Each structure stands twice: as C-alpha cells, then as structure tokens.
C-alpha cells in the first residue's frame, strides 16, 4: 500500500495539521470532564431531593409529632473561586431546607426555613476548593448490587456453585453447595443453614410445598434430609438463633427480625441499579434460551397456545414469546402460611426438560417483573434466586464473571456525596427523635429540633479525609484532565491493595472502549486505578457505556446512528472494528470482516454484523491517545509514556509537537487550564491579565451586539505541585470568536494545543559512553536559549500565635541578628517583594517570649534606668530552607484585625511566595512520549556536539541500544516524520491506530528532500572527522519531567538527632544524613577498615559526648579525641535492665564504666554547640 500524503485539518484558530487519518470520524469527542460535572449536577437536581424524600417524615416514638422536608435551595457562594483560594476558604454555598412540623394531636402545622451548613460547590473545571486547595473527587469502581452465581471447585475437585445476593446496603444472602450435595444459605455472614429453612420461614412450611415449588430433584431431597425443621415457626426460630445467638427466641421476634433485615426499605437498599440487575438476571428468557419446553404455554387472557410441549426455544421462538411472558404466561400466585409475610407471592414458573436428561423436568422460576421503585428484596426474588441456583446445578443458566464491566459500576462524585450526606442525615435523625420526646410539644419549632452538626461534619470529613477526595494533580493540563477521569477500585466499600488478586487487575475484554487498557500506574496499584476511555460515558445506573455505529439489518449498511452500549448489552452483539473497509454507501467491501464477539476476535460474514466501532481511538484514554505511533510501541512502554506525559513540567516557552495525534487541541480545551469563550462575540480589548469580548447574537437573521464579557487571566500563580500556572492571550483585538473557543492558553499550551515539551534535534548514537544505561547527552544550546527552562513557585508561611508566655510578635528587632541580614525586611519584619534570597536568609522576622527568669537587684536597677526589655525572647523567624532560594514573588498578610478567618490561637499569618527559574541541569529526568526516559549525564558545549553536513549541531544524543529491547519503535518513526515535518514547515497529526504507516513516513521524508534512509553523515565536533556510519537524526518531542535534581540534592554537616537513639534523622525533609546500614558495615569489615568503621559507628553517629568534642576539635584544628560509648549501646543496656537483668559495662581491666544519664542541661549545651533542633514529636524519628 503506497503512502497517502494526508489532508489538512484545522485545530482551533491558529493551527493546521496535515492529518494521516484514513477513517472519517462520525462522532465528536464528548466533553472530557462530563463524568464530573454531570454527576454533580445530578446530585444537586435529583440526589439531594431523593435523600430528603427517603428520610422524610421523621416521627417521634409516640407518633405525635412529624417533621417533613418540603424543599431546599442553594444560595449564592460566600466567596468567588479566586477569593476562596486566596483566603484558604471553601468554595461553598449555603444550603437552606424548608421544614414542616406537624403536631398530630392538635393538627397544628409550622413551616420554617433552616440553614443546613455550607455545601461545597463544583467549579466549572470539575474541581472543588476545600481550604483554599483544589481537590478532585475520583470516581470509584465497585461491584454492582445484584445477584451473582459462580462456579467453584471444592478440595476434592468436585464442581459446586456459590451465589451471593449483594445489596447496596443491608444483609447479604449467600447460597452454596457442600460435598454432600446439600444446598446451604448464609444470612449476613453467619453460620450456614439448609436453604429449605429459609423457604419454610417465608411460609412454605411442609416438605411437599417446597418440592412443588422448586421441583423434585436430588439436591433438594438431600437438603430436606439435612433440615431439622418441619414447619414455618420452627424455621423462624432456627434463623433467629443464628442471627441473634444467646437471646431467647420467640416467633414474633424472629418474624420482625427477618422483616427488618430484608423487607424494610430503610435497612435494606438495592438502589435502582440493584433492582435493575436482579430483574435482568432472574428473568426467564436467559434460562429458556435453547431449552426444550416440558409444558404447553397458554395465553391466560385469550387461551391460545403460544408454544407447545417439546418445542425447542431458539432465538427466534424465544423472541416471539417474550411479549407473552411479560403479559403473565406462567404466573403463579403462592399463598404462604405462618411465614414472614402475610401477602401472597407472585412468581413466574415454566417447566423445561433437563439439558442432559430428556425424562427429567426442571422448574424455572422468575421474579415476575417487580417494579423499579421497589428498592428492597422481595420473597419472590428470594424464591427465584434459589430456583436459579438449583437450575445451575442441572446445567441451566450461566455463572457470572465479577470482573466483567457489566457487573462493576462507577460511583461518581454525586453518588459518593449522596452516600456521605445520607450518613449525616441519619445521625441527625436520631438527634431529632430524641429532642422530640424531650421538648415541649406546644412551643417547639423545626429550628430547635434540627442539629446540623452531624451533617456538616460528615461532608467535611468526606472532602477532607476520604481516600477518594484527592489533592488535584496540577503539574500540567493533561495531568489535571486525567485526574478528573480517573477510576479507582480502592477506597471505602472498594478493594484494598493487599486483597486484590491478579484477576481484578487484569485487562478484561469488556474494558474495550470503556476503560483504557494501557494507562494505569506501575507498582502496587497497577490495574486498580484506571482511566476512562476517550469516548466513554456513564449511564444513570453507573455502568460505563461506549458508542457504536448501528448496522442496518435490512440493507447491511453502516449507518451514522450511534448507540451507547453497556458491557452486558454488548455481549449480545457482533461488533466490527473501526478500520473495516466500507464503500460509498457504507456497506462492507469484504465478505468476511474482522469482528469481536464477547472475548473472541473472529472473521465473520458481513451479514452477521450488528455494530461497528466509531473510532480507532475509542479503546484508549486521553493521555494514551496523545502518543503518536502508539500502534508501533510495546504496551509496557506505552504505559510509561502515558504516565510520564502527566509529569511534564510546564516550560517557559512551550511549543506544540510537530508530530501530534490531533488530540492536543481537545485535551487542552477540556482540561480547564485554558480560558474559553462563554458566548459568541468579537474581541474588543486584549491585555496580559484581561480579555474583553463583546457578545454578538443572531436575532431574526440580524446581528445584535450585547454586553461585554470580561475574562481575567491567571498570571504566575503557584499550582498544587509548585509549578507555574500562567495564562496568555491567544486572540487579537477584532477577532470573531465562537462559544467554547480558546481565548487564552494555559500552562503547557501553545496556540490552543497541549504543549508539554519541545521539538529538538536528536541523534541516535553513543558518545564516549556518556549515554550508557539510557543516559542523555545534551547540547549547551538548550541551556543558553532557555529551551527547557521552567518556573517554579514555592510557598512558605509563618504564623504568630498566642503562647502561654505571651503572644509571638513579627518584628525587625531580632536578637543576635546583624543589620546586614535585615536589609530586605520592611519595618514589620516582612521581606519585600522582588528581593533575591538565598538559603537561610530571613523571610519573616518573628520572636517568641521565653520564660522570665528572676532578676538580680543590679539588673532590675539597669532595667529601670535604661528601660531595657525585661522579657527574654527567642528567634523563631521564618528562613529560606536549603535549596529554596529565588526571588520573592508575592507576600500575603492575614490578620485578625483585617477580618480574615484564622485558626484559633493565630493572630497573624504571613505567606511568602518565592519563584525560581530552573534551567535544565545534569541529573534532571527527561523523556519522550514512548516510555523512553533517561537522566541527563552531560551537557556539552555546542562546539563539541556532532554536527550535520550543513553545520547544524544536534541537540540531544540518545543511546541506540535503548530501542530494540524495549520495542518502542514509535520513537524512530516519530524521529523521521518530525524531521520531514520541520523541513516542510508543517505540523502533522497521526491519530492512534489510524495514523501514518511506514510508507507515509517514507513518502513524507522523500517530499522533504531528505535521504531515502532518512539517515545522515555526522561529524565529530571535537575533531571534525566524520563518524564511520550514517546516523539516524531527526526531530523528537522531548519533555522535562517533574523529577528535578534541585529537589533531590541534599547534604548534611550536622543537624537534628533522634531523641531516643541519638542517631541522625534520615531524609531531605528532616535535613537528615545518609544511612550507613548493615550491608555497608559488612563491606568495611571485609576490608578490615577498623578506624573508619569505629568513627562511623560512634562520633559520626550517636556518641553524644564524642561528637561534640570532635566538632570542637575540628573547629580549633586539634586532633580528634578517642570515641566513647555509643548511645544506642546504652539504649540496649537500658532495655535489658528494664527486663530485669543486671547488666553492667566493664572496661578492659574489668572496671565498671558508669553510664552517664542524659540530663536536660546536656541537651541544651549540646544544642548550642551544634545549633540543632531537638525533634519534639516522634514522627520526625524516621526509624528504619
């Protein structure tokens, strides 16, 4: 197939790309953060009302008072989004609820509106602002409520079955077989009972009733033999003893216990999704498919025969009788006696012959279409689920795969919030009931009954500390977008890392088009945290749906009609791939088409195809769809590529890739990092911080101008990860803009496209071994021209509190600090904006009162004369930590007097923002988009870099050995196509699974006038001689990752010590030392390096006296004294003594060595000598 030259596609206002796509897309990508916004909107519109409806009315124990929830409304938020961030507040709106209190004795009605706390609002970008920080609520993947059947082998290898009825909340019902072919039931994880006990308790007391109901079979006979009860009352008592062991059982108690466990909507909730799944599973049609009828089916109304005995129900026959099934064929009304429920039970029952035995009849029982709004389980559900279990034992029916996405659903923001709110409301309900019984009924008002504390607390707890409420990843727009589309199987009610096996983590065929098979973290969470595929949507039940183009069964044409299918609906259809060839009419050109049916990939006759994929990229997530030539990369490397793009640091001068995939525009627009137009209009005014757009609308075919929309751009703000969040205008005055168009680029954006890195000239070659093990050699040009320079903003804060000895004070007047150190502080002791600061410089001068000592008479006299301060103060100023130098960007001051909300005990809070400009540096980590990552090992002068025949030096040298074994060939194709694109002055788009193939790349290379093999001769920059072989040189898109050497570099001279062991702390955060561990000690022992070893184990570590003396000796230039006894040895002896052993330390001549107990004085002296801080909390003691 020869390469086609591609066609031009416009992405936004400023960018045209040559696209190599062959498949025309029928469906636009949906709004990528819809999963967040739609779910929260549902919560505001429906979810809240649903909850108030569930809990209303609240009645007191006597039934005299009743409190009803009438209506609710959300007010205006107290602060805007920006202001909430600045003030460390929540972006929230007051929730007011209208209540009605009815006094049933007097008939008096009181209405009142009650404030129920501030409710956090979602911003337009799909995030929440909690305490000034942007957070995202991640959607959770959980097992859907419903009834599940699974096959299992016992220890003898005999096949048995298990089944579970899982509610949304409430008691579980589990059925299982044992080695003796007895069917047992467990109620709510208690000891097992024969299943017939449960049936008797439902009111089918005698053996004969049970046999008539379920149908005669060996399993049932075995179970009845094992069953000790013989009527409903005994069965009820038996169940009560299991559920409430040790309590005296009575029949009435047992009845009410079972009713409250299963049939009370407040205690047992299937949710609408559970009801839907149970009705679907227990429907007769799946069990009747391809079975032989053992009775004649007659329409109950007309009396006509629908199907006769001995008919085989294939797909066609079954489709014909399904409407009759729904009209009541086979309905039986059961009249239970003495059971839990008095009412009759309606089931649907049909007899068939056993699949492996034509003589044997089997009863199939369904639950006869229970209404959607019945959210608790019913007796007919229990009977039909038991019937299904017996059917399974005879080979009728299917077991379920719990990893199938038809059985796993998403709990998104709205539902998670609703569950949390429900917990708060039910706690409140208890309080209301208590208050109703205590207070005077005549004067009481709704306001006095309600206590909003539990509701507010449960919402606060959810946003503040739930596993699913996460600090937003704001490194770059792609990280932000991916975080909002993340699906986690962890969290409350989900799995735990330790318990999750391989099956749950694995890719499943039902993930196709719903969850990305590639993007997931490496490490312990692999497969438990996933990403939503690009076209996927979530339906009202929380199942993920993916779009398919419908194939018209009459004409076999692929239509543009789109159906969204869930995973279990898709199981019934044959689906063709998106790249199947079609002619102009939309029919398949080939007789046999590659298609999927469930887990199979088959070649199918074109007439059998029901649906076709909408797009090749519907399989993968947004981040994965940004990798060009994904189809040429190994999946493990593609995973790393997708994950590393999210860690790209926004650069000072971003540049969109020459070789893109066409996803760059959409993902940048939907991420929320760009400024987008809210209405059509004309740009009137553009400046760095503001864009004005005059609205324009069409009325009766005429243009009408409206008001002005003002968009403010955020300049140089610190993101959650300390990168620089900066927006720049993308339009000019006079431009016409349409709704949704990008007006301002966010961080890592260029001309309205995602721009995570830079296009650089790359050669695949070695150079003196400096790129061994994936290391990267770089030209100094990239440093000089600020190609990979990024801006980082760090925030430091200092608060003045009230202490027991008096308030702390922010001041310039600091003890023992020279004027030189204070030169950049203003009169309040706060650093000025624009000052350049280095390690250990003062940012905020602050003093804390020390304890006042008794003064001598002379001192008192002096103080009286000179008015000296008698109080002693200690310097507790905020200083720049190691490696934190830079330029002061901004200072924010919050005080009580100015009316700022501060935590209790804090009088003043100062925040200082320091900005750093970081150029690329040896030790920084870089990567391409194909999982090809490496650390910069050497930055060479431009003149030493290899250069091309026209004299251009290359920018980066990568090791060619990094390609073959990693199998990410995509980077080589990108290299050549990028070179051609640069030569032609174009940008190209090569969408995943439908992009440029090898021929396209070669034809573009030829068009650009490059050599046929796309390689070139390179000359050594040092000697000017040509290298032996031709070398692949091209343009690759490389990104700088957030793992920067400046954040990791760390050195300690002396510093804090752990309190008990007196050993140095570890880690950069604690200013710790390097651990010299067990194995390192062995290495020194092997060389017999006794003195080195001794000083490492004593004076460099925990010989308290020795290290102080050593420090003094070094300062004075004397020789280092003999080491003493390490503190850890003393700790060991103290531990032995505390166990009651008499252990003494003896010297060489058997003299006892006195162990000196450390006093507080020693600590202070030592601290002065070392200028160190004693860690006051045990958390700082990072012990191994």
Swiss-Prot record:
Subunit relationships: The RNAP catalytic core consists of 2 alpha, 1 beta, 1 beta' and 1 omega subunit. When a sigma factor is associated with the core the holoenzyme is formed, which can initiate transcription.
Q: Which family does it belong to?
A: Belongs to the RNA polymerase beta chain family.
Which InterPro entries has this protein been placed in? Answer: DNA-dir_RNA_pol_bsu_external_1, DNA-dir_RNA_pol_su2, DNA-dir_RNAP_su2_dom, DNA-dir_RNAP_su2_hyb_sf, RNA_pol_bsu_bac, RNA_pol_bsu_CS, RNA_pol_bsu_protrusion, RNA_pol_Rpb2_2
Q: Name one GO cellular component term.
A: DNA-directed RNA polymerase complex
> TM spans, by residue?
none
GO molecular function terms here?
Answer: DNA binding; DNA-directed RNA polymerase activity; ribonucleoside binding
Catalyzed chemical reaction(s): RNA(n) + a ribonucleoside 5'-triphosphate = RNA(n+1) + diphosphate
Provide the residue span(s) of the region labelled Disordered.
Answer: 1160-1184
This chain is encoded by the gene named rpoB
In the UniProt record, the signal sequence range is none
Phylogenetic placement of the source organism: Bacteria, Bacillati, Bacillota, Bacilli, Bacillales
Could you identify this protein by its name? DNA-directed RNA polymerase subunit beta
Sorted alphabetically, which keywords does the UniProt record give?
Answer: DNA-directed RNA polymerase, Nucleotidyltransferase, Transcription, Transferase
Domain of life of the organism encoding this protein: Bacteria
Tell me the function of this protein: DNA-dependent RNA polymerase catalyzes the transcription of DNA into RNA using the four ribonucleoside triphosphates as substrates.
- Among the Pfam families in the record, one is RNA_pol_Rpb2_1
- Give the enzyme's EC designation: 2.7.7.6
List, in alphabetical order, the GO biological process terms annotated in this UniProt record: DNA-templated transcription
Specify the enzyme's EC class, one word. Answer: transferase
């Amino acid at each position: 197939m020869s390469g086609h030259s591609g066609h031009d596609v416009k992405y936004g206002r400023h960018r045209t790309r040559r696209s190599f796509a062959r498949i025309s897309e029928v469906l636009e990508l949906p709004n990528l953060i819809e999963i967040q916004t739609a779910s929260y909107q549902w919560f505001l519109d429906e979810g809240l009302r649903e909850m108030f409806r569930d809990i209303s009315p609240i009645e007191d124990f006597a039934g005299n008072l009743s409190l009803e929830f009438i209506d609710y409304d959300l007010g205006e938020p107290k602060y805007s989004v920006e202001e909430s961030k600045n003030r460390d507040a929540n972006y929230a709106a007051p929730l007011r609820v209208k209540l009605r209190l009815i006094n049933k004795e007097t008939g008096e009605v009181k209405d009142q509106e009650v404030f129920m706390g501030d409710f956090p609002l979602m911003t337009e970008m799909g995030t929440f602002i909690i305490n000034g920080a942007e957070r995202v609520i991640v959607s959770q993947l959980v097992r859907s409520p419903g009834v599940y059947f699974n096959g299992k082998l016992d220890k003898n290898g005999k096949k048995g079955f298990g089944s579970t009825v899982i509610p949304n909340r409430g008691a579980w019902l589990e059925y299982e077989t044992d080695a003796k072919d007895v069917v047992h039931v467990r109620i709510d994880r208690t000891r097992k009972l024969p299943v017939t006990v449960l049936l008797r308790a439902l009111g089918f007391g005698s053996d004969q009733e049970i046999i008539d109901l379920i149908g005669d079979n060996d399993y049932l006979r075995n179970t009845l033999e094992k069953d000790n009860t013989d009527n409903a009352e005994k069965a009820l008592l038996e169940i009560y003893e299991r559920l409430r062991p040790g309590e005296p059982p009575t029949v009435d108690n047992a009845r009410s216990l079972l009713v409250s466990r299963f049939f009370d909507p407040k205690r047992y909730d299937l949710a609408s999704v559970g009801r839907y799944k149970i009705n679907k599973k227990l429907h007769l049609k799946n069990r009747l498919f391809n079975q032989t009828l053992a009775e004649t089916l007659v329409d109950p109304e007309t009396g006509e025969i629908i199907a006769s005995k001995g008919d085989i129900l294939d797909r066609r026959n079954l489709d014909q009788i399904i409407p009759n099934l729904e009209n009541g064929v086979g309905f039986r009304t059961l009249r239970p006696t003495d059971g839990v429920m008095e009412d009759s039970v309606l089931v649907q029952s049909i007899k068939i012959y056993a699949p492996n035995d034509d003589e044997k009849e089997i009863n199939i029982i369904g639950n006869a279409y229970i209404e959607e709004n019945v959210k608790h389980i019913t007796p007919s559900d229990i009977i039909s689920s038991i019937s299904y279990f017996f059917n399974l034992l005879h080979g009728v029916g299917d077991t379920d795969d719990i990893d199938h996405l038809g059985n796993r659903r998403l709990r998104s923001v709205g539902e998670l919030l609703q569950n949390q709110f429900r917990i708060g409301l039910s706690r409140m309900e208890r309080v209301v009931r208590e208050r109703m019984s205590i207070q005077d009924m005549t004067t009481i008002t709704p306001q006095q009954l309600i206590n909003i504390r539990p509701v507010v607390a449960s919402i606060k707890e959810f946003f503040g500390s739930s596993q699913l409420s996460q600090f937003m990843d704001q490194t770059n727009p792609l990280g932000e977008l991916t975080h909002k589309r993340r699906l986690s199987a962890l969290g409350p009610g989900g799995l735990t890392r330790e318990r999750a096996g391989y099956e749950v983590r694995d890719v499943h065929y039902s993930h196709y088009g719903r969850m990305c098979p590639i993007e997931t973290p490496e490490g312990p969470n692999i497969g438990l945290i996933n990403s939503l595929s690009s076209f996927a949507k979530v339906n009202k039940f929380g199942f993920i749906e993916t779009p398919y183009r419908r194939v018209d069964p009459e004409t076999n044409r692929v239509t543009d009609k789109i159906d969204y299918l869930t995973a279990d609906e898709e199981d019934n259809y044959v689906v063709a791939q998106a790249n199947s060839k079609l002619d102009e009419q939309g029919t398949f050109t080939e007789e046999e088409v590659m298609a999927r049916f469930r887990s199979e990939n088959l070649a199918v006759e074109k007439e059998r195809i029901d649906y076709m994929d909408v797009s090749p990229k519907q399989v993968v997530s947004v981040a994965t769809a940004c990798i060009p030539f994904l189809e040429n990369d190994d999946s493990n490397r593609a995973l790393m590529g997708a994950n590393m793009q999210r860690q790209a640091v926004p650069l000072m001068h971003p540049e969109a890739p020459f070789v893109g995939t066409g996803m760059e525009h959409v993902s940048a627009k939907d991420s929320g990092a760009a400024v987008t137009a809210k209405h059509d209009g004309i740009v009137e005014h553009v400046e760095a911080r503001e864009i004005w757009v005059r609205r324009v609308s069409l009325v009766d075919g005429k243009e009408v101008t409206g008001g002005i929309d003002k968009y403010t751009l955020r300049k140089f703000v610190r993101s959650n990860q300390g990168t620089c969040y900066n927006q720049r205008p993308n339009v000019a005055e006079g431009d016409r803009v349409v709704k949704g168009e990008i007006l301002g680029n966010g961080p890592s954006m260029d001309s309205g496209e995602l721009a995570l890195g830079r296009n650089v000239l790359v050669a695949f070659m070695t150079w003196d071994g400096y790129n061994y093990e994936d290391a990267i050699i770089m030209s100094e040009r990239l440093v000089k021209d600020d190609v990979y320079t990024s801006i980082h903003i760090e925030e430091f804060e200092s608060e003045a509190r009230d202490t027991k000895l008096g308030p702390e004070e922010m001041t310039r007047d600091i003890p023992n600090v020279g004027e030189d150190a204070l030169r950049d502080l203003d009169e309040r002791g706060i650093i000025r904006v624009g000052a350049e600061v280095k390690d250990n410089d003062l940012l905020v001068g602050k003093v804390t009162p020390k304890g006042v000592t008794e003064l001598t008479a002379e001192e008192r006299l002096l103080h009286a004369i000179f008015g000296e301060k008698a109080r002693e103060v200690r310097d507790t100023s905020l200083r720049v930590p190691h490696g934190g130098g830079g330029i002061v960007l901004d200072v924010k001051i919050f005080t009580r007097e100015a009316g700022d909300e501060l935590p209790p005990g804090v009088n003043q809070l100062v925040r200082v923002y320091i900005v750093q400009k970081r150029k690329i540096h040896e030790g920084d980590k870089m990567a391409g988009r194909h999982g090809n990552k490496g650390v910069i090992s050497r930055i060479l002068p431009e003149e030493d870099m290899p250069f091309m025949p026209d004299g251009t030096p290359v920018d980066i040298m990568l090791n060619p050995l990094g390609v073959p074994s990693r199998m990410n060939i995509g980077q080589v194709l990108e290299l050549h196509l990028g070179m051609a694109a640069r030569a032609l002055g174009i940008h190209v788009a090569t969408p995943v699974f439908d992009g440029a193939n090898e021929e396209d790349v070669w034809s573009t290379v030829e068009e650009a006038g490059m050599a046929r093999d796309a390689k070139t001769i390179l000359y050594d920059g040092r000697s000017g001689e040509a290298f032996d072989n031709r070398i692949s040189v091209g343009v690759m898109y490389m990104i700088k990752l957030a793992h920067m050497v400046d954040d990791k570099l760390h050195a300690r001279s002396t510093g804090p010590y752990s309190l008990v062991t007196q050993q140095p702390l570890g880690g950069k955060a604690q200013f710790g030392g390097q651990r010299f561990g067990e194995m390192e000690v062995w290495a020194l022992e092997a060389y017999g390096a006794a003195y080195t070893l001794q000083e490492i184990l004593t004076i460099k570590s925990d010989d308290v006296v020795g290290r102080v003396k050593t420090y003094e000796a070094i300062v004075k230039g004397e020789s280092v004294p003999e080491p003493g006894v390490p503190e850890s040895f003393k700790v060991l002896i103290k531990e032995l003594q505390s166990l009651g052993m008499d252990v003494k330390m003896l010297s060489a001549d058997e003299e006892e060595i006195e162990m000196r107990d450390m006093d507080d004085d020693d600590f202070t002296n030592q601290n002065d000598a070392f200028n160190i801080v004693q860690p006051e909390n045990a958390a700082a003691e990072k012990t191994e």
